[in-house]
């Protein structure tokens, strides 16, 4: 009884932690490791969705902590009008709270379940899906579970891709440059995924887009059978029928998407050039995950809105996920940019670090612009292979004597960015760097500070 009382008391404390900023409402959905609730931001009155994850259950399942980190990292990478946005991540000792954009219109699946869509409606949703998927692929992200159940609608009827739990990043590729994990929903999965011989995640996503388009236009699946083996046979042969009510242009697009050979499957640029797709298409404007225009908004989300403070931003608890592991391992903090970010620790104050970075950047021929708090934007003065390279740098103080500095790719060529971080700036920063990400220096005793850190 006493133990149960303590657990209930702990739950109340955690609810107050969330309710201090968010009001929890009805349960929206539930999975093996998480529950998703409707919530309201008490500061702005906006509706949000809050995913509540139990850390103990994560720890008991091998690989789930890393999968959660990767999912959140990916959501931060792919900020786009047609992707469900992540607002912030909070944590207590027992739970992680992922605060996301709330899609009031529910699943696209619910619309299709009532019957097929008109071609005009199907086209609009498909245009938004392709725009989102193309953006994700441009960031190196393959979704791997595209289906109407993972496509939500906001109150304006705008499509939002969600559920990046199975998504893959470039570092998950094997030496052959392919993915090998078989995942996804069978009826929507590409034949090369089912064959377990390695596959290109982006090309596999396009097959799934083809199945989604078919479902929107027809109201049923192209490959379906109560026996999985027979359904797989249909998928391997691309054996399906297009109903007569589907227009010729739409039919031709489906045929080019549902091609068994991934090398011959239509690409996203080719999709966007087809007459059927181009009709009425207005490309959405994506939001850069580290754009200087978003600095102030990010500060409000992470700092609790103290726009007058010029102190370094401290990390929230989830950024370290420190209560999931022992020691002072910062490697999990900065996965939001994956390849497009480099991190080092320093024992110098954040102000000194930024001042040094500004001097080094200018010495390399970059213009330097200070942002709010301890943020700095460095921009090349000449065009590179893919426009002008721009790098955003931010210093965070995770303890009184430890600062963490993150480089993030803002614009320009990724290879040039990697060279900038790995070669160009390192010599000039040698006197302030304690360790680069991946090193294992002897760390000071700051575990308590990292567990309890909160917005400044």
Swiss-Prot record:
Disulfide bonds: none annotated. Residues 22-277 form the Protein kinase domain. InterPro entries: Kinase-like_dom_sf, NAF/FISL_domain, NAF_dom, Prot_kinase_dom, Protein_kinase_ATP_BS, Ser/Thr_kinase_AS. It is an enzyme of class 2 (transferase). The active site is at residue 145. Residues 163-192 are annotated as: Activation loop. One of its GO terms (molecular function) is protein serine/threonine kinase activity. Residues 339-368 are annotated as: PPI. Residues 309-335 form the NAF domain. Its cofactor is Mn(2+). ATP binds at residues 28-36, 51. CIPK serine-threonine protein kinases interact with CBL proteins. Binding of a CBL protein to the regulatory NAF domain of CIPK protein lead to the activation of the kinase in a calcium-dependent manner. The activation loop within the kinase domain is the target of phosphorylation/activation by upstream protein kinases. The PPI motif mediates the interaction with the ABI (abscisic acid-insensitive) phosphatases. This is CBL-interacting protein kinase 16. The lineage of its organism: Eukaryota, Viridiplantae, Streptophyta, Embryophyta, Tracheophyta. The gene is CIPK16.
